[in-house]
From Swiss-Prot:
The record marks R260, G261, K401, E402 as: Reactive bond. Its main location: secreted. The keyword Lyase does not apply. This is Kunitz-type protease inhibitor 1. Inhibitor of HGFAC. Inhibits serine protease activity of ST14/matriptase in vitro. Inhibits serine protease activity of TMPRSS13, via the BPTI/Kunitz inhibitor 1 domain. Keywords: Cell membrane, Cytoplasm, Disulfide bond, Glycoprotein, Membrane, Protease inhibitor, Repeat, Secreted, Serine protease inhibitor, Signal.
Length: 529
């Protein structure tokens, strides 16, 4: 019996070598597909759920960085990744990220990328990113944000009856009684979410008063009462700031940030109790950072670095700037999405990162600040083949209330049309004369509008795992086929050997040897590899 086992092992040895080699190849290939960004922090989607929350990818456009940041978009970071879907996964693990912009390597296909940029395209719930045509880039947006953008483009150049100042805005306010909101003519306000004790009163056709607001968030739906726009609605969020939130939005020192852009902004000075202008660099700012002075005043009216009298007459004491308690690291082991994780696992508020003052025990919050600067600089250096990006902007009446006749360009009809300009803010798709409008935007059509062309599929985690499973099954089938071939070949040799040279063993011994050999082959081909 022992010699038979030895012979069986000897016969199987040649088959074992290619089997092991193939198994190692399959295993290494499988391991290579598992690399990727770290798992998402608490509250953020990961894996297949993450990838499924993004669009397939809009090709042929690049972010107009200066215009987007000027509108309120936020550059988050530029991680080093190898593939497009890794960039999307990095967006999933980054708080407030809703755009993953991928720069492709020339002539290397869709999965070889040169750079990855993560952006927050929302400001006050509005989509504020702007794009310009440029080959070699793919944009992945969260489906929710992309859907809002497409709805905006679908409404397109017909306009909306919702006053511009209130379309999708997110108000930050101090506790006050009542909150008076002006320029709301022809709108009905209905509470969708929040404390139901709040009352909406209209004592003037042009303004509403909100009574009973407490700390927390309220969602109102505005509906146009004008017959010209019977179905127009918009949501407005009102957040009554708590003491802790007021520290962030009103008492934090103005923070230029590490990036070297130049964007005019407003911040609140609690010492003088006024809003002041400053120049924002483009990244790593804090919440005391407003696009318009009106927002700043509404959020921080009456806040000072000492006693503050609330609507109920109680005294609320605010420190000069964020409390020292919030500057101390918390080493509980779990960081919130709004916190920065130090290298030693401790947590600090995210606005303390790269503020030129080490707040982590190991100073890791000041160790990698150049990555933001280099990523933002690279994004700003991208050139556009055309300077006609304003020609695809929707006509913007602005925030003022004048009635100035102007012309705007419609890329779908490739003609210019009239609209009424309010006199301030707005955009550059705004011309005094029709001929000036046509000459400025000649050649621009719907193909230049972001998001209305074909999309490129993005591999999901599920599809990658399926590909890995198929690859593994193929490897196993090949191994089994090789082993089977070698086994039957050796069996055939045994048959011819027995026919010409009968072995000097009893028949029972021959049967036992054959069963033993089959037993060994079965174990070798079916045991876990």
């Amino acid at each position: 019996m022992a010699p038979a086992r030895t012979m069986a092992r000897a016969r199987l040895a040649p088959a074992g070598i290619p089997a092991v080699a193939l198994w190692l190849l399959c295993t290494l290939g499988l391991q290579g597909t598992q690399a990727g960004p770290p798992p998402a922090p608490p509250g953020l989607p990961a894996g297949a759920d993450c990838l499924n929350s993004f669009t397939a990818g809009v090709p042929g456009f690049v972010l107009d960085t200066n215009a987007s940041v000027s509108n309120g978009a936020t550059f988050l970071e530029s991680p080093t990744v190898r593939r497009g879907w890794d960039c999307v996964r990095a967006c999933c693990t980054t708080q407030n990220c809703n755009l993953a912009l991928v720069e492709l390597q020339p002539d290397r296909g869709e999965d070889a990328i040169a750079a990855c940029f993560l952006i927050n395209c929302l400001y006050e719930q509005n989509f504020v990113c702007k794009f310009a045509p440029r080959e070699g880039f793919i944009n992945y947006l969260t489906r929710e944000v992309y859907r809002s953008y497409r709805q905006l483009r679908t409404q397109g150049f017909g306009g909306s009856g919702i006053p511009k100042a209130w379309a999708g805005i997110d108000l930050k306010v101090q506790p006050q009684e009542p909150l008076v909101l002006k320029d709301v003519e022809n709108t009905d306000w209905r509470l969708l979410r929040g404390d139901t004790d709040v009352r909406v009163e209209r004592k003037d056709p042009n303004q509403v008063e909100l009574w009973g607001l407490k700390e927390g968030t309220y969602l109102f739906q505005l509906t146009v009462t004008s017959s010209d726009h019977p179905e127009d609605t918009a949501n407005v969020t009102v957040t009554v700031l708590s003491t802790k939130q007021t520290e962030d939005y009103c008492l934090a020192s103005n923070k230029v940030g590490r990036c070297r852009g130049s964007f005019p902004r407003w911040y609140y000075d609690p010492t003088e109790q006024i809003c002041k202008s400053f120049v924002y660099g483009g990244c790593l700012g804090n919440k005391n950072n407003y696009l318009r002075e009106e927002e700043c005043i509404l959020a921080c009216r009456g806040v000072q670095g000492g006693p503050l009298r609330g609507s109920s007459g109680a005294q609320a004491t605010f420190p000069q700037g964020p409390s020292m308690e919030r500057r101390h690291p918390v080493c509980s082991g779990t960081c919130q999405p709004t916190q920065f994780r130090c290298s030693n696992g401790c947590c600090i508020d995210s606005f303390l990162e790269c503020d030129d003052t080490p707040n982590c025990p190991d100073a890791s919050d000041e160790a990698a600040c150049e990555k933001y600067t280099s990523g933002f600089d690279e994004l700003q250096r991208i050139h556009f083949p055309s300077d006609k990006g304003h020609c695809v902007d929707l006509p913007d009446t602005g925030l003022c209330k004048e009635s100035i006749p102007r012309w705007y360009y419609n890329p779908f009809s490739e003609h210019c049309a009239r609209f009424t300009y309010g006199g301030c803010y707005g955009n550059k798709n705004n011309f005094e004369e029709e001929q000036q409008c046509l000459e400025s935007c000649r050649g621009i059509s719907k193909k230049d509008v972001f998001g209305l062309r074909r999309e490129i599929p993005i591999p999901s985690t599920g599809s990658v795992e399926m590909a890995v499973a198929v690859f593994l099954v193929i490897c196993i089938v090949v191994v089994v086929a090789i082993l089977g071939y070698c086994f039957f070949k050796n069996q055939r040799k045994d048959f011819h050997g027995h026919h010409h040279h009968p072995p000097p063993t009893p028949a029972s011994s021959t049967v036992s040897t054959t069963e033993d050999t089959e037993h060994l082959v079965y174990n070798h081909t079916t045991r876990p590899l």
